[in-house]
Design a protein with these regions (language model features):
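Aromatic- and Gly/Pro-enriched helix-to-coil junctions and flexible linker segments
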Residues: 19-128
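Bacterial N-terminal signal peptides that target proteins for export
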Residues: 1-9
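Bacterial N-terminal signal peptides
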Residues: 8-17
């Protein structure tokens, strides 16, 4: 077997293995409308819609992109390009006080859903 051929195959396998390990490198843009809004509708609007308890207590409505970006009566919960500075991400990822983990009193979001929110914020929190 030719040494150059063997080295080429080994190099290709190493590159493919590294690429396969990078599960967080999306091949498409993560947007609010396509990726985040379905999560919000399924897990957040039960409490964070007009007249609901979460919205009343925090002032945080989540019924539109604009409302999500506006934040609570205490200030923004999303800092575009910085999930680690964004309360929304910290709350759903379990990185904040457990007594205020979101969704409150419900099952946690899946790892995939949390990753989608983190990537969306880290890529600028764009609408579409």
């Amino acid at each position: 077997m030719n040494i150059h051929y063997t080295l080429s195959v080994v190099s290709l396998l190493i590159v493919a293995g590294i690429a396969a390990c990078d599960k967080e490198a999306p091949f498409r843009k993560v947007t609010y409308v396509t990726d985040v809004e379905p999560i919000v509708q399924q897990h957040c609007l039960e409490c964070h819609a007009a007249g609901k308890e979460g919205a009343e207590k925090s002032g945080y409505l989540m019924d539109s992109y604009e409302a999500v970006m506006k934040g609570t009566k205490f200030g923004p919960v999303i800092v575009p390009d910085s999930s680690e500075s964004s309360s929304l991400y910290l709350l759903v990822a379990g990185k904040a006080d457990p007594s205020i983990h979101m969704p409150h009193g419900k099952a946690a979001l899946s790892d995939e859903q949390i990753t989608i929110i983190r990537l969306w914020i880290d890529k600028g929190a764009v609408k579409d």
